[in-house]
Amino acid sequence: MLFSPTLSSPLTPSAVKIERENLKQFELENFSRYSIFELIENRCDFYDALLIQLWQEIELSEQLGIALIAVGGYGRREMFPLSDLDFLILVEQTPSPEIEEKITQFIQFLWDCGFEVGNSVRTLEQCESEGKQDITIATNLLEARFLAGNRPHFDALNELVKRADFWSKEDFFNAKVQEQIERYQRYHNTAYNLEPDIKYSPGGLRDLHLLYWVALRHSGALTLEAILQSGFIYPQEYQQLQESRAFLFKVRFALHLILKRYDNRLLFDRQIKVSELLGFRGEGNPAVEKMMKCFFQALHRISLISNLLIQHYRENVLPSNQDTVIDQLDDDFQLINQCLCLRNSFVFQEKPARILDLFFYLTQYEHANIHSDTLRQLQISLDQLSQKLCEIPAAREKFLRLFNQPNAIKRAFMPMHQYGVLTAYLPQWQAIEGLMQFDLFHIYTVDEHTLRVMLKLESFLSQESAQEHPIAHRIFSQLSDRTLLYIAALFHDIAKGRGGDHAELGAVDIADFAQLHGLDRREIDTLAWLVKSHLLMSITAQRRDIHDPEVVMNFAEAVQNQVRLDYLTCLTVADICATNGNLWNSWKRSLFASLYEFTGRQFSQGMKELLDYSEKSAENRKLAQQILMRDYSDITPISIEQLWARCPEDYFVRNTPKQIAWHTSLLVDFVEALLVKISNRFSLGGTEVFIYCQDQPHLFNKVVSTIGAKKFSIHDAQIITTQDGYVFDSFIITELNGELVEFDRRRELEQALTLALQSEKLPALSIVPNRQLQHFTVQTDVRFLQENKKEHTQMELVALDKAGLLAQVSQIFTELNLNLLNAKITTVGEKAEDFFILTNQFGQALDSQQREILRNVLYRNIG
């Protein structure tokens, strides 16, 4: 043993606790000195020595018909600092009261030492009956390892679990694979989550265990080395599995050393500490990102190889009653029972461009899979490539052809990524494989996100997308050639992790790719522009005032034409949806639809003059009046005009006809001082909070503090002041998950806002610490946008999205006598990116001195 514990005799819980702590200290101090396998072996030896000595001291060793057997992870000698001690006490018959007392004493002692114990006491007959009913028990028994007591009794258990009538090889295989399917579904079939589980995520240790269990049930192979010697895996597969297993073991061991309670999730705070223990260096996030890149690559290799071997077992080892049906596809490929097979094992080595044809055939035969033997030949060939596939002219032609095939992304590009073909084709791809960004915004690694963007684009073809993404569905369905958009998606983030502007660098990469693949100058320019500008629409829609004609003109000038607008819209929507499933909601849909509509109008009108919103205002007035005349018989045109005469022109542009009609119906005969109404019916994409009252100090502060205290997300705020000093304030809110607000919650918020606005006191800031936010730092940035407007100032604020931030900002505005006209609230993971339109107390734009004072106060208070 590396560390020899001093186990006193007789054993005492306090002495064992001291030795456990000494062992942990030894492991912390020597973590980088010894291999992870030595550390795990050493810990297992310590447990064995402890349990065997305890067994003897309690005099259980003197009982002839009883055996102590390690099972589960302890049985396979896979023990980490916080692993459970799983063991079976195998008895010949129901224990006598005396033996039962000794067994209780044995288990109680381990509990007193602080161990988490997973124990069972069974007869051989009980092992058989319970094991037959429960695959988990059967699996535990399969990994049984003798520790002490009656050896023949243990041997009898071993013989039992090998019998075909206990669990047949086929039934055992199918049950374990079904467990894996259900586990993958719990993790959304991806290993690339922000805070992954080392054990249970796809590609995690459970995938390795599945491989062990199948091999153990089939041939009795106890270790990865034994599986190699049996010929079931190739040497290169063994090497990759061994390296990946070692890395996951190191991460899990380090995680257990820093925790006090058992857990296998790599939460954000733990990622930082584990990366330090593993020796990853770098200021701030890079160390974590380097470690997680290695981690995700290990998961990918384990998932790929273990699933390939499971498929190999099903296809080549398990019996099949299926008649063989062979379709010859060409000289090199054939379809055998819907499995793509090579007719010659050396096809890929001799003609590497034919690798792309394998995936072409996947798109042509929607029910086909790739045979495991073909996949193994593919892996061998990829390892032997002397150049990137894109350097082969025939491969380039085949690669471009794939984009126009049915279900090209799902059937070709997803498998190409899974099996390493994209890495073999694109020089830049390997750098983004497993690359994560240590933030709350990007929940997938860059490579996984990229494929999800492409898959989302492909989904726009389905009729199901017409409701959720009507504009993208219409555009994408009408494109005669979708190749350019797919290529733009493939490259939009390809330069991440290099330093510098990834959009600028990616534009260079995609231009080189397009030129190499023979695209014309127009296509090259379009692709380079799309990658360089892929964030433009997102920034404009979410962080600019899209009702400002200058904003629309600037955006239209950058986009240049309707074709590019269509491309950019599809790419932007797909990018947002594939970044984080919670980001897209009905509010964002309406926001992007408005920008798309305004920009289209600008193109139709021409680029010489700003978009004329008077036409939009008149149109909205007309439609709102039609709604009022249709739905509210007691409202007269005269009363409508009297109310509308108080409102600035801006009001009729920034609100939809439904909103205007709703506001009007509420106010046309309203004579009281305060009105708060909340509805889901009239605002596109969110729940609207409408407030009418006389303007008052701290109004915005009171509203956002109250909304925040009730745990809603604010997406947009409009402050319209009438000519007689009243405000028409509209806030678009949702639940934190992006859903509309239900009736009871709306009534509750109405009451809270009414009380807050009637009170002279400011609401107390409700600050609930966020576990995830504690581990991130965001550099506060205050930026004033350059514009020539004298009537207002536009400001961007980037800061950590801590609780009460918006209320804190609004309080600063009040203290500096600033008026807020409009706000857009955007949360990007842990980061708030907010946009405000302000005036000073005289209703004018802020001068340079006022801007500098505001900047300094924000920095000082927000940090």
Curated annotation (Swiss-Prot):
Keyword Repeat attached: yes
What Gene Ontology terms describe what this protein does at the molecular function level? Answer: [protein-PII] uridylyltransferase activity; phosphoric diester hydrolase activity
Q: Where is this region: Uridylyltransferase?
A: 1-328
Region Uridylyl-removing, annotated ranges: 329-687
What is the required cofactor set for this protein? Mg(2+)
Q: What InterPro entries does this protein map onto?
A: ACT-like_dom_sf (IPR045865), ACT_dom (IPR002912), HD/PDEase_dom (IPR003607), HD_domain (IPR006674), NT_sf (IPR043519), PII_UdlTrfase/GS_AdlTrfase (IPR013546), UTase/UR (IPR010043)
Q: Pfam families, from UniProt?
A: ACT, GlnD_UR_UTase, HD
Q: ACT domain spans which residues?
A: 688-772, 794-863
Q: Which PANTHER family match?
A: BIFUNCTIONAL URIDYLYLTRANSFERASE/URIDYLYL-REMOVING ENZYME, BIFUNCTIONAL URIDYLYLTRANSFERASE_URIDYLYL-REMOVING ENZYME
As for what it does, the entry says: Modifies, by uridylylation and deuridylylation, the PII regulatory proteins (GlnB and homologs), in response to the nitrogen status of the cell that GlnD senses through the glutamine level. Under low glutamine levels, catalyzes the conversion of the PII proteins and UTP to PII-UMP and PPi, while under higher glutamine levels, GlnD hydrolyzes PII-UMP to PII and UMP (deuridylylation). Thus, controls uridylylation state and activity of the PII proteins, and plays an important role in the regulation of nitrogen assimilation and metabolism.
What name does UniProt use for this protein?
Answer: Bifunctional uridylyltransferase/uridylyl-removing enzyme
Q: Which gene encodes it?
A: glnD
